[in-house]
Swiss-Prot record:
Heme binds at Y36, C56, C59, H60. It comes from Ceratophyllum demersum (Rigid hornwort). The chain crosses the membrane at residues 286-306. GO terms for biological process: photosynthesis. HAMAP family: Cytb6_f_cytF. GO terms for molecular function: electron transfer activity; heme binding; iron ion binding. Coiled coil: none annotated. This is Cytochrome f.
Amino acid sequence: MQNRNTFSWVKDQMSRFISVSIMIYVITRTSISNAYPIFAQQGYENPREATGRIVCANCHLANKPVDIEVPQAVLPDTVFEAVVRIPYDMQLKQVLANGKKGGLNVGAVLILPEGFELAPPDRISPEMKEKIGNLSFQSYRPNKKNILIMGPVPGKKYSQIVFPILSPDPATKKDVHFLKYPIYVGGNRGRGQIYPDGSKSNNTVYNATATGIVSKIVRKEKGGYEITIADTADGHQVVDIIPPGPELLVSEGESIKIDQPLTSNPNVGGFGQGDAEIVLQDPLRVQGLLFFFASVILAQIFLVLKKKQFEKVQLSEMNF
């Protein structure tokens, strides 16, 4: 009887442990995957500042290229592709939050004109769905459906991102007109260097906070360093904390100056932004243009026929 109770207790404890482990995994995985878009969403009402700068550049300090490709013109109520390319060297490894090396992730923000929005799933063709893959897109705000964000996702698989976009119809949306509109895009590869609260991540360079001599360097058990700097001016000591990730550049007994780099810069990623233009084309204008071209072609044909008829008349009169 006692053995049966013991077995039951062990079974209950194992079940609880497994349940708690699964919950922790789900919670941490969700928070990590959603962290980067949330930084911008929580801190800024609009991701594009009045100066034209996209706010992601406040945390991703290195400047890198990004490219966007959209059709020159689209008709109303039409689904089209906005292709964002975030190029980088696939062999590069970035410093992760725990100080280890891993692959780069990518993310993007697409700022569309008012009225343009993410295409509903039932409007996306099978060919376009295949290009999109397993990517998930979301609106920057519930009331800003024209601003889309995506990521972070593995860069090796998604350095090219296809956004399925639905164009508006001015017939049903009176604030939309048949005009040329700008589209803005921002794309990053790798982790940022600064968090929204202003603190540094471990994916950046750390500088000395005082001038003096490095009196002690302690390597911490979980990685990183504590660097003690003895100020030569008044003798007081300053301790700089270096998280796991950056490589140390100084040694004990070395003289250093304030703001001198204590570590290398491990960042291999960066952020870039670009823009494109798209025309919301009026179908009646297209039909009118086609009618005009057809009229010109028909007029030229009639002129040629009339000329040949006139030449025949002249030839017959000369023979007569």
